[in-house]
Amino acid sequence: MFGPSPPCRSLSGRISLNFVSRVGTLLAEHPHIVAPSLSSLGLSTERPLVLVDVDEVLGLFMQGFGDFLVGHGLEMRIDRFALFQNIYRPGASEHLEVAEGRKLFDAFFAGHCHEIEPAPGGIEALIRLAKSAEILILSNAPAEAERLRTQWLRQHGLPHPLILNSGPKGPIAAGLVAQTAQKSAFVDDLLPNLDSVKDHSPATATFQHVADLRLRPFAPTSERHPRIDDWAELADAIEAAIRS
């Protein structure tokens, strides 16, 4: 989703956090550095690999963050495809200062990101896809979100490893995909991330999904990446893309 990007970290229950700390940043600065090994994350290289975002893909971030803002006397107005520029004081004509929005963003992820609702059909689709593919959750979120984001995944029946990335997702996605000869797919709501993955890993099938109904009319699209906002249809498309 929108907002600042933290250092890359992984929470899989199978690998030391120190091993993957700052991997995303290092990959961006030093392209020769490899991503965490799939085996160390508990993933097989003998099955297709599906990389999936969380905010506005698996989870309704804008809805949850909006509820959080109400508790702070603010409101979220969805009138553009943006984050901080949609935060207002009630009755105000100008959005909240971005610096203040960032503080609230960090506070939300530090203490409330596990409260977001799942995107309709997303959990069921991942459970279905996991029968024939390896699933890895690749999310740009502050480092403070590690524990609660993993808790959110587990409470919804998703045991898959989580990597918190920094910046564009192409470098780390390419490093992960390069470890398997099987087909791969990537799902995100943001075109910069989708373009980054397609640029770094052209063979990876990329799909755009925007979960929040209010955001969909404002979300830019690209012919490079099929836009599929229904998770059942998206799961069909992913299965077709990774089928041997």
Question: What are the functions of these language-model segments?
Answer:
Residues 15-100:
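Active-site neighborhood of HAD-like aspartate-dependent phosphohydrolases
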Residues 44-45, 131-132, 177-183:
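Glycine-rich phosphate-binding loop signature in dinucleotide/nucleotide-binding domains
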Residues 88-121:
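Metal-dependent phosphoesterase signature
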Residues 113, 117-118, 122-152, 163-165:
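Substrate-recognition element of Asp-dependent hydrolases with the DxDx(T/V) motif
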Residues 142-185, 192-198:
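Substrate-recognition "cap/lid" segment bordering the active-site pocket of phosphatases
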Residues 161-167, 224-233:
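Short acidic-hydrophobic, aromatic-tinged amphipathic segments that line or gate anion-handling sites
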Residues 171-175, 215-223, 237-239:
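Short, charged, surface-exposed secondary-structure boundary motifs
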Residues 186-229:
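Acidic, Mg2+-coordinating phosphoryl-transfer loop and its flanking beta/alpha structural elements
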